[in-house]
Every structure is written in structure tokens, then in C-alpha cells.
Amino acid sequence: AELGPVYDMPVRDSEQSGWVNALSLFQEDDQRLQDIVAALGKAFLGTENHHLAASGFMIAYLTRVVYPLIAQYVLENRVIDVSLGNLEFHTKGQGFDATALGQPRFAALPDDPDASHSDTEIVPDEAALYARLKEQLFDGNFGLLIPALCRSAKASEKVSWNAVAASCAH
């Protein structure tokens, strides 16, 4: 469902070039990730401090991933697939100007209006949907992202997990 620009997570335009897969970025290209985080720190925060730049990157990332995921869960009873393998970033210079899903996959309850959609994973009940939400956030995303940021961009693990907790509570 379209929930507005802050809460919507569009599907990548397959005709548009310049997309990079999140799994590739966070698991295979430490130097590129370090360069992107450093560029963000300089451009938006006016700093070369690795910790501040990594925190700024984390906040921007959380806004584009957690808000749409939680909004879909609360408002539509859906859990969109935000695993790193399904997330894409559109590059612009040394940064990104868009975040999107590679495929429109989501988990939903049996009575969802789009339950018959080919990209829908039907879960039996609300407890299973909530378990899927936690799996998407932690196993499929932050459990891979935070170690990558710590390794390549010198992020603080504690600060990063605190930012995740704060964004989920927002």
C-alpha cells in the first residue's frame, strides 16, 4: 500500500540503472561502504569523524527501512521483505538518493486482500506475522548490517543497536 513518501517502500524500477543490492554492499564491498559513510559524514554532517559519520548513516538507513516496515505491519498487517538480499539503493555520486525493494515480497495473513499475489507469503496468524517482522528486522537485516558498519566504517556496535531500538520505538 502507498503510505506516503516517508512510510512507502517502492519496488525498484528495473528500467533504471544505478541500483546496488544491499547484501552486496554490506557483505562484499567494505571499501565502498566505508567511502559512502565517509562521504555522508562530510556532506551532511560536516565531519570526518568515523563514529559520527557511521551514526548519521545508520539514522538515514533506519528511516528508510524501519519506518516503512513498521508502517506496513501496523496499518496493513503485512511484513515487507527488507532482507538485505531484497533491498536496493540507487546511487547518486558517492551516496544514495533512493531505497527500494528488489521484489514486492511480503508476508500477510490469510484474509489479506492480496493473499493470492504471487509474491505473498501467507502466515497462519498474528503471532507468526510478528515473528516474521522480527526475523526481517534482525536476522535478515540488522544482524548483517551492523557488523558490516562496525568492520568497514568503524561504527560503534552499541550506538548502532541503540539507534535500532530507538527507531523501532518511534
Labelled PLM ranges:
Residues L23-H170:
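Hydrophobic, aromatic-lined core segments that form the binding pocket/scaffold
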Residues A1-D35:
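A eukaryotic "domain-start" boundary segment
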